[in-house]
UniProtKB/Swiss-Prot annotation:
Any single Pfam family the record assigns to this protein: Cys_Knot_tox
Domains (record comment): The presence of a 'disulfide through disulfide knot' structurally defines this protein as a knottin.
GO cellular component: extracellular region
Descriptive protein name: U21-hexatoxin-Hi1a
Family: Belongs to the neurotoxin 21 family.
Disulfide bonds: 41-55, 48-67, 54-82, 85-92
Signal sequence, renumbered to the chain: 1-19
An example molecular function term from Gene Ontology annotations: ion channel regulator activity
Alphabetized InterPro entries for the sequence: Cys_Knot_tox
Protein function: Potent insecticidal toxin with probable ion channel impairing activity. In vivo, reversibly paralyzes all flies within 30 minutes, even at low dose (0.3 nmol/g).
Amino acid sequence: MKTILSMLIFVALFAAIVGNRWNLGYGIPHKQVKLPNGQLCKEPGDSCSKRDECCKADDQKTYSSGCAQTWSAMEGGFVRECYICAVESSMC
């Protein structure tokens, strides 16, 4: 019983941590470009301070990208993260 409970907790934590990046559009094809400051653009799920730092989707007609404030249980508050989502999605 203890082993099963431990496995369930592990799976739940793994899904919460890994699933968060996928919810932010990590699996959507995007362009990895160099910014004017010489750094690469930030991928979905990375922390950001403004929209220009984030990578843009390959298909910009279907997908929108940017930097938005989201809740982070690990940080214990709100953080700003890059995202890519479908324009037609109600979550975007």
